[in-house]
Amino acid sequence: MLTHLDDQGRAHMVDVGDKAVTQRQAQAQADVRMQPATLDLLVAGELPKGDVLATARIAGIMAAKRTADLIPLCHPLPLSSVAIEIEAHPAQSLLRIISTVRCTGRTGVEMEALMAASVAALTIYDMAKAVDRAMVIEQVFVRNKTGGARGDFQHPLTPLDTSE
């Protein structure tokens, strides 16, 4: 059943008023594949537009906070934290963005995590396109989520993190 449709098939915002307030967390990932020389410039901080990685982190955080303004039917959520990690993977010639979003609320933060990772990737593309127009944004997905009535989720493409 699609929760965003009423009994007549019309879109509506899901009523979460009766759901329990719980700790929620979601992680999302986006990869930006690029030429090896572009990755070297990014990691060294030598692109003409400045510190691309710091700008991408800030853009991702801002995007998570604006998710309800951009995705129809998303609830505005009081986010507790948004973290953006950007890892260089030279062997695959890509940057991997992992966003982690937390809140205490009645609905999950998967969309906020996806927005954060996606907009961070778009920012990297925007700031590096002058040197590499062939970059590809790929593998955008929810890695995991915790909290809520439907329980935890771990995407099969990501290893289980047991460090916490």
From Swiss-Prot:
The active site is at residue 126. SUPFAM superfamilies: Molybdenum cofactor biosynthesis protein C, MoaC. Substrate binds at residues 73-75, 111-112. It holds the Pfam family MoaC. Gene3D superfamilies: Molybdopterin cofactor biosynthesis C (MoaC) domain (3.30.70.640). It comes from the Bacteria. Keywords: Lyase, Molybdenum cofactor biosynthesis. It is an enzyme of class 4 (lyase). GO terms for molecular function: cyclic pyranopterin monophosphate synthase activity. Its EC number is 4.6.1.17. Homohexamer; trimer of dimers. This is Cyclic pyranopterin monophosphate synthase. It comes from Herpetosiphon aurantiacus (strain ATCC 23779 / DSM 785 / 114-95).
